[in-house]
């Protein structure tokens, strides 16, 4: 049935007036809390599903999270949080390390978490050229890494590090070359374990469940409007490991439904499992 329009206001405190400015500084009023409006329809038998979305700016998200956690711990805050450069004399009073990279990548690749993927990309830039991380720094770090290992992918364009950019480009042959190289690296087991398993878990849970390939393909999938892709490793019934990359895009001026791309993927994978026989 049609869903009534819902309007949700983020629980981030907003100031009605600006905080006093120090001499020589300009203070701005905190922005009003953003509103998320949801419209559309859904089937009456839809199961519960969680869809993570970040509707706040990074500054609002950080300020709101700090405010909530601080008050939860019994603290109080007077005034408002403003987005500005940290004073030169500021000192870090606490820092926290993330989970190990292989655990982070497992969360990203199994469920196709684009937000986390982008954060890892930005962290790459910060490690390469110092904080704060940026897309420009991250791209430079990636270029250096590829060049040091002898890779040359002229067509490569990584926009924001996630799967939600229509500017990102790579050829299937280039991605296959990279995956073949990665298979012989000492960290290969961690990389493969981070990928969804066909018919078993992650984004591939419901695909090819009752077919021989179920449980034998570790792959990263990606689907947006007019594009459907898979890339990873397949173990055939003769014990051979294959690198498989299939990037399916709509022709100019045409549309591509996700299931159209899936049909191509599944046909290719069945062919491999049948022995990869040429006509």
Annotate the PLM regions:
Residues 1-189:
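A small/polar active-site loop signature that marks catalytic segments
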Residues 121-279:
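Small-residue-rich helix-loop
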